[in-house]
């Protein structure tokens, strides 16, 4: 719809939106670094009258507080905050703007208090902002609150998705959680912004009208999610910190300053790793994987490639430069992605040229000689044991800064996963020269 402006967070596979009216804007589910929303508002010289949240997010920090710091916006949420500046999205909630009406529709399932927002004109629903309820190719996952509530939330999700069947086929659906989001349960790639008609054709969970089958398919699709999920709740309920108050990491070549810190090697070359560092290549899921192994209270230092440090400009973190400059500043993008998930204690940024690199022990299809691998893929994949899946190992490190002794004592010193990223990450934590990981294909394809 022309009225709706879409923004994407590639790192988290999430969407957020602006509804653009003639005189004002309404923002929906913005992330902590809400610069694109604020810049769009400045560009149009239109105020942001409301910030609507479909749910208290588990996977990222809200940008509502950054927006409220600049605009006199009304913050609309589905449950009470610790702040005084909010309005509840209850059964009486409605915004009337220039002939349009926005109302809330209770759609529990992803969370107990989840709501969707309906954009209407003259009583006709034009679009639904579905948050973590119905997504383009599935529904929002129902296991994030607590395992004991998964069954109840799944039942709620079934009833909530059925409410969407009451809308006309032409109604657009704008989900917050996109394809690849850990908050979603999906079946196959589909357009990001479907209509009700396309959902009825292509979204298997949306189509399913038998609850038992729906529940079985949803639960069986629930994979692992990063350890930091849930740690965002206090912030999103009002214990927030503006990005401008975060201590900015210092760029240094002094390798002694990061003693005692956890060191992250963010360089992208799979064939090398920084000595005594955890190897997490700086790709589109970097913040998620850091959040899988690093508690947000843990001080860290990050090694970046020299060329990226050359392009680093602190002003980009605070939205004090042109948006085009941020696009070429990979480190600022990475830091904002980390801030978005609550990882703030980044003390130092270190050039790759100033640290010692080790050649990683990897096996490719060309060098494979029949070694026995220990597969650390998720427990629902055929060759893995749940107790030593990547998720279990990473969560143990997240809590204890160490791996389970039972795992470290395994005779198999060869780790594998689908792409090599998770195996390389765990291998780098072990920091054992004998540990070899598969870095370019799964074990199955070697035979």
Positions of predicted regions on the chain:
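Core dinuclear metal-dependent hydrolase active-site scaffold
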Residues: 2-4, 17-20, 94-123, 166, ...
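Active-site metal-binding loops of divalent metal-dependent hydrolases
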Residues: 30-31, 56, 110-111, 131-134, ...
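Active-site neighborhood of phospho(di)ester-bond hydrolases with catalytic His/Asp-centered motifs
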Residues: 27-29, 47-57, 75-79, 106-109, ...
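Rhodanese-like catalytic fold shared by cysteine-dependent sulfurtransferases
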Residues: 90-92, 141-143, 198-230, 268-447
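Active-site metal-binding motif and surrounding structural segment of the metallo-beta-lactamase
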Residues: 32-77
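Active-site-proximal cofactor/substrate-binding loop regions of enzyme domains
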Residues: 38, 66, 75-77, 82-117, ...
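Divalent-metal (often Zn2+) His-rich catalytic cores of metallo-beta-lactamase-fold enzymes
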Residues: 155-245
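Conserved beta-strand hairpin/beta-sheet module of binuclear metal-dependent hydrolase folds
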Residues: 1-47, 117-131, 137
């Amino acid at each position: 719809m022309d009225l709706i402006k879409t923004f994407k967070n590639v790192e988290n596979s999430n969407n957020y939106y602006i509804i653009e009216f003639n005189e004002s804007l309404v923002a929906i589910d913005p992330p902590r670094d809400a610069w694109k929303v604020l810049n769009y508002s400045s560009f149009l010289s239109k105020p942001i009258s409301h910030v609507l949240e479909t749910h208290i997010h588990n996977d990222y920090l809200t940008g509502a507080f950054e927006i409220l710091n600049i605009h006199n916006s009304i913050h609309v949420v589905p449950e009470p905050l610790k702040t005084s500046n909010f309005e509840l999205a209850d059964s009486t909630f409605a915004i009337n703007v220039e002939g349009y009406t926005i109302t809330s529709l209770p759609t529990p399932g992803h969370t107990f208090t989840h709501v969707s927002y309906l954009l209407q004109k003259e009583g006709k629903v034009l679009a639904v902002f579905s948050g973590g309820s119905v997504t383009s190719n599935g529904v929002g996952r129902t296991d994030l609150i607590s395992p004991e509530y998964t069954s109840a939330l799944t039942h709620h999700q079934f009833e909530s998705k059925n409410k969407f069947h009451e809308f006309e086929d032409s109604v657009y659906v704008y989900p917050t959680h996109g394809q690849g989001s850990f908050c979603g349960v999906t079946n196959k790639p589909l357009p990001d912004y479907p209509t009700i008609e396309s959902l009825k054709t292509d979204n298997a969970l949306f189509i399913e009208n038998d609850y038992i089958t729906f529940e079985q398919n949803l639960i069986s699709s629930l994979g692992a999610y990063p350890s930091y999920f849930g740690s965002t709740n206090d912030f999103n309920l009002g214990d927030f910190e503006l990005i401008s108050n975060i201590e900015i990491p210092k760029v240094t070549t002094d390798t002694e300053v990061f003693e005692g810190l956890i060191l992250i090697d963010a360089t992208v070359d799979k064939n090398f790793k920084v000595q005594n560092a955890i190897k997490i290549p700086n790709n589109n899921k970097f913040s998620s994987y850091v959040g899988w192994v690093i508690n947000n209270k843990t001080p860290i230092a990050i090694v970046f490639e020299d060329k990226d440090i050359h392009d680093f400009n602190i002003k980009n973190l605070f939205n004090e430069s042109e948006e085009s400059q941020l696009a070429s500043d990979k480190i600022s993008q990475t830091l904002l992605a980390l801030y978005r998930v609550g990882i703030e204690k980044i003390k130092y940024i270190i050039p790759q040229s100033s640290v010692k690199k080790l050649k990683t022990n990897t096996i490719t299809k060309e060098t494979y000689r029949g070694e026995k691998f220990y597969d650390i893929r998720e427990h629902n994949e055929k060759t893995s044991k749940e107790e030593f899946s990547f998720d279990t190992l990473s969560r143990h490190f997240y809590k204890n800064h160490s791996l389970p002794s039972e795992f470290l004592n395994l005779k198999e010193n060869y780790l594998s996963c689908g792409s090599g990223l998770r195996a390389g990450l765990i291998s780098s934590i072990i920091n054992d020269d004998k540990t070899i990981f598969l870095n370019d294909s799964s074990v199955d394809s070697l035979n």
